[in-house]
UniProtKB/Swiss-Prot annotation:
UniProt keyword annotation of Heme present: no
GO biological process per UniProt: apposition of dorsal and ventral imaginal disc-derived wing surfaces; axon ensheathment; cell adhesion; cell differentiation; cell migration; germ-line stem cell population maintenance; glial cell migration; mesoderm development
Subcellular location: Nucleus
Keywords attached to this entry: Developmental protein, Nucleus, RNA-binding
GO cellular component: cytoplasm; nucleus
UniProt note: phenotype after gene disruption: Flies exhibit wing blisters and flight impairment.
Organism for this UniProt entry: Drosophila melanogaster (Fruit fly)
Official protein name in the record: Protein held out wings
GO molecular function terms listed in the Swiss-Prot or TrEMBL record: mRNA 3'-UTR binding; mRNA 5'-UTR binding; mRNA binding
Quaternary organization: Homodimer. Interacts with Sxl; promoting nuclear retention of msl-2 transcripts.
Expression tissues: During embryogenesis, expression is seen in mesodermal precursors of somatic, visceral and pharyngeal muscle. Later in embryogenesis, expression is restricted to heart and muscle attachment sites of the epidermis. During onset of metamorphosis, expression is seen in muscle and muscle attachment cells.
Amino acid sequence: MSVCESKAVVQQQLQQHLQQQAAAAVVAVAQQQQAQAQAQAQAQAQQQQQAPQVVVPMTPQHLTPQQQQQSTQSIADYLAQLLKDRKQLAAFPNVFTHVERLLDEEIARVRASLFQINGVKKEPLTLPEPEGSVVTMNEKVYVPVREHPDFNFVGRILGPRGMTAKQLEQETGCKIMVRGKGSMRDKKKEDANRGKPNWEHLSDDLHVLITVEDTENRATVKLAQAVAEVQKLLVPQAEGEDELKKRQLMELAIINGTYRDTTAKSVAVCDEEWRRLVAASDSRLLTSTGLPGLAAQIRAPAAAPLGAPLILNPRMTVPTTAASILSAQAAPTAAFDQTGHGMIFAPYDYANYAALAGNPLLTEYADHSVGAIKQQRRLATNREHPYQRATVGVPAKPAGFIEIQ
């Protein structure tokens, strides 16, 4: 084989080898892309499986009656705290202007949420553009007192301090007034004013007078909304099932300052339970069988108002003079029964321990004239002269004795 032929064979083999490598590379790339696609698909499937489920928050309509009661209670607690803050802020008028505005807005918002019966939120009234001149429109909604003579419709419409009617006026833009027989609280005043000018409504049956001033197209919408809301209030509810009445009484307690915060009540209950447990443990320790005489000697402890109970010893007499310290007083007898346990115990009072123990140093001072107490000298006769020397306890001088000075 010639050199040229050998070169051609080598080139052909080299081309085949390169083609095989290229085909293998293409297959490897395809396999790699396929593996990546499979891995991405598996990752997406795992993410879909592990993705948290979207939990739709429970609206008040979906709450159970117990959950609705707890929600109403928490709203009332918050409203009571806001009103308390508002009263405290009234001591600084025109100082915290923005704080007062924000607090008033929050009180209005919380109060509106308090009166969302069955989770029904009242949407703001949508009014058309004003057209024409301003007119005054009114309508009467009669109260069914003949069908339900024992039901308090007036209190249900007005609410505590007239707050329900005021809120309805703000929502509808109408003026709401209770008129007719039985609309006044003072029956004597009502009878006296019946038939007088400007009191003609007392001759009519009990009704709700709704008045609005606006353009005709807007006044019609406002009046219809107010009539619908008043008619809802005129539907009597069974005793104990009137949610509006419960919330009105709750608001009245908040306004009067007699509302009991549930958080403070729970703290008081826990504190009372803690005091009861402490008293029970103390009584158990005092009545233990190993110390039969202790219950009779020590006074039963009372729970301290701000801390753990204290056991106070009876009032003790503390010696203040040397005579009381040196008085011969016997030690008190043992307070425990030594039979059975062999314990020797003499309960000395530490404040009077020196006198009870009979300290030998104190008794030694009592027997000598050079002790702690100095003897006082007394004159038997009066002095003839203020500067005259007096001799006490000195024997008389013998006759003929001459004193040399």
